[in-house]
Amino acid sequence: MEQFSALLIMSIRFGIAGLVLVWFTKPPWGYMREIFVVALIGSTIQYGLTYNGLKGIDASTAAILVQLEGPILALMGTILLKEKLGLTRALGMGFAFLGVFIIAGEPRLDGHIDSVILLVAGSTVWAVAQIMISRLKGLSGITILAWVAIMATPQMLIASLIIEDGQWQAITSASLVDWSIIFYLAFIMTVVGYSVWYHLLSSVDVSKVSPFLMLLPITSIIAEMILLDEKLTLSMIIGGLMIMTGVASTLINWRWP
């Protein structure tokens, strides 16, 4: 989205989500420090790294690197939370990741190693934040999201004012379509999507939910076909089937002789 800079759009998105949700939850006073750190690491720093990394890299490579969030999160759950990843789940995630590779196409890294580092760093700090969220067992997904959004909004706005420019002009000149996208991001992706995600993190093992992150390319393809009239290709079909097969295999309780 070209109208708004990266941190500005995220501050508006989380600000709207926070203002909507804060009325439905009580302040978690005993967890405020942890939530502040989660907001700083998992929102402000992560989005700053990821969006700046996306600027200097092609779409295929970006699509593959962003999907590292799932494997990194599963690995951290195994190391930090002592969860059992298991051979089947690891192979399933690997198979799904190969499907992402087929959909995205051959990555091109020449001269873009700095962008690669930023994207991998963004995925890593995001995974750290999700591990922290998984430890907030006494809070609901809506409570976590509401107060992460409230904490992250001023952080990202301050960061935007420091390293970006043209904020006021972007806001005042935005079209109805631009604001429609903002509200979609705030309500559908943030209020609905993150509420469900945070609830799962606080109630299910990280290694069990992380494979579902790899379904994102499939939802992106469906959205592009509906909204942008994109055509379904053979690589999309093969890659999509591999992703769904890989994710499904992580849910089956295989018993090996």
Protein language model annotation of sequence segments:
Residues 22-66, 74-76, 100-102, 186-204:
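Specific transmembrane alpha-helical segments of multi-pass solute transporters/efflux pumps
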